[in-house]
Design a protein with these regions (language model features):
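Catalytic cores of histone-lysine modification enzymes
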Residues: 3-103, 189
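C-terminal SET catalytic tail plus cysteine-rich post-SET Zn-binding segment of SAM-dependent SET-domain
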Residues: 96-195
Length: 195
């Protein structure tokens, strides 16, 4: 006797609901051990050229609408996966600077695994791993203790911290200059001499 694959499928380990990080998120529907395969990140397989075109199009749209929802995931050197296409609940997993999940590519497919033990109700997150060259376009709202303020790969954090330190020093110098200007006594206008 064979059971249908539908009856044999495991219950979902996640649920989609409102997130404090960014609109919609994915949350653990059960306690999970480290290295648990949670969900597959699915979508349309596209070339790097098409990926770049869509990315630019989405960034232009974001400037107009404020919605910067980009679900393009690097698959390999030739292809990306556009998770905005089709049924893909994994696209709602938000970024965190202290993620509890990570993505792995297995035989051309992307799976999200738990990095550590996760409690039922915890929001599932992973580090999006963006390049440093676009850091200003991607502020981070994760709220974790070690948040660096922008969505970049952890390997870029030391350089990003140096950049932010320089920006802060430049801004502080500018503010001190403005404060000094404001503190200067205003010269009183000289009275006109009587003739």
């Amino acid at each position: 006797m064979h059971l249908s694959s539908h009856l044999m499928s495991a219950p979902l380990l996640y649920e989609v609901r409102e997130s404090e990080i960014h609109n919609t998120g994915i949350f653990a529907a059960a306690d999970m051990e480290p290295n648990t395969r949670i969900v597959e990140y699915v979508g349309e397989k596209i070339t790097k050229k098409e990926s770049a075109r869509r990315g630019i199009e989405l960034m232009e749209k974001a400037k107009e609408t404020g919605d910067a929802a980009v679900y393009i995931f690097t698959l390999n050197k030739r292809y990306d996966l556009d998770g905005a296409q089709g049924e893909n609940p994994a696209r709602y997993i938000n970024h965190s600077c202290d993620p509890n999940c990570e993505a792995f590519i297995e035989r051309g497919r992307i799976f999200i695994y738990s990095k550590k033990a996760i409690k039922k109700g915890d929001e599932l997150t992973y580090n999006y791993g963006f390049d440093l060259d676009t850091w200003e376009d991607h502020p981070c709202l994760c709220g974790s203790e070690n948040c660096v303020g922008f969505i970049v790969d952890e390997s870029h954090w030391p350089k990003l911290r140096r950049i932010l330190k320089r920006h802060a020093a430049s801004r502080q110098k500018w503010l001190e200059g403005e404060a000094a200007k404001a503190a200067k006594p205003v010269k009183k206008a000289r009275k006109a001499a009587k003739i």
